[in-house]
Amino acid sequence: MKRKLKMDNLNINFINDDEHPIPSQDLLLKCLQLVADKHHISHAEVNLNIVSNDEIQQINKQFRNKDKPTNIISFEFEKPQGLPDDIANDFLGDIVIAPAVLENEAKEQNKEINDHWQHIFIHGLLHLLGYDHQDDQEAEVMENLEIQLLAQLGIANPYIEQENQNGR
């Protein structure tokens, strides 16, 4: 199933061929709106690919050399030479999400599934905008921004429980 969801000048192209369960698409569009507003982006388009655990494991192995399923992988758009800026600047990239991984994580972490979806989607969008978490400083910047954006959606800090478990 392919579907385009549009709000003003923001688009999410949903690719969900196996029809995996996903939350309300409006929730995800609201996440894109928040991230776009925060970064003063007036036009944006994202491909959201919903895949099985096996598919994301293959992608994770191919692009990250990690032979296991993960919740999300983001691919920032690299503008091909010759593509006009007005077209290239709108497309942020591709996000691949495995719903089964998200469901397991939400259960393990006692989180509402829709809250976890929104968190992980925002996380992926931030990767498309160049944020990363390769070191503690980058992680702190990215996590703080996620916490701030999620608070605007009425979602509690997703890192509190993890911080308590990790002794941070």
From Swiss-Prot:
Keywords: Cytoplasm, Endonuclease, Hydrolase, Metal-binding, Nuclease, Ribosome biogenesis, rRNA processing, Zinc. SUPFAM superfamilies: Metalloproteases ('zincins'), catalytic domain. Its main location: cytoplasm. The keyword Cell inner membrane does not apply. Its EC number is 3.1.-.-. Pfam families: YbeY (PF02130). Zn(2+) binds at H123, H127, H133. Binds 1 zinc ion. Signal peptide: none annotated. It comes from the Bacteria. PANTHER family: ENDORIBONUCLEASE YBEY, CHLOROPLASTIC. This is Endoribonuclease YbeY. It comes from Francisella tularensis subsp. holarctica (strain LVS).
